[in-house]
Amino acid sequence: FNCKKEGKSFEIWGSGKPLRQFIFSIDLAKLMIWTLRSYDEADPIILSVGEEDEVPISDVAYAVAKSLDANIGGTPLEVTFDTSKADGQFKKTANNQKLRKYLPDFKFTPFEEAMDITVKWFLENYETGGVRK
């Protein structure tokens, strides 16, 4: 957001190639409520999107830029990658197989849709004090 406001590029450390799993806060809230009400096992359960939904960090950066551009307008936000910085671990996959056993039909919000909703919320709440600066 600050890069967009100040006309600077959005710099990402590393190549952007590592994969990560992202869960929309509303989806996580629904799963946490389900866990509190219905999950009775002593063994933990992982509340995560599936491995097939892993997203490269570069896609995250481009999705943020795209959503900011769509909601603010102006000069498109340039995304750059500082490959002098380490990528870190390539994958940090959490297995949601157990969750799928209990909730096979749970629909996770698609990543780009969740990102757009999140950016819109951020922009609506930034100046009102709903977001820490």
Task: List PLM regions with ranges.
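C-terminal substrate-binding subdomain of Rossmann-fold SDR/epimerase-dehydratase oxidoreductases
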Residues: N2-K133
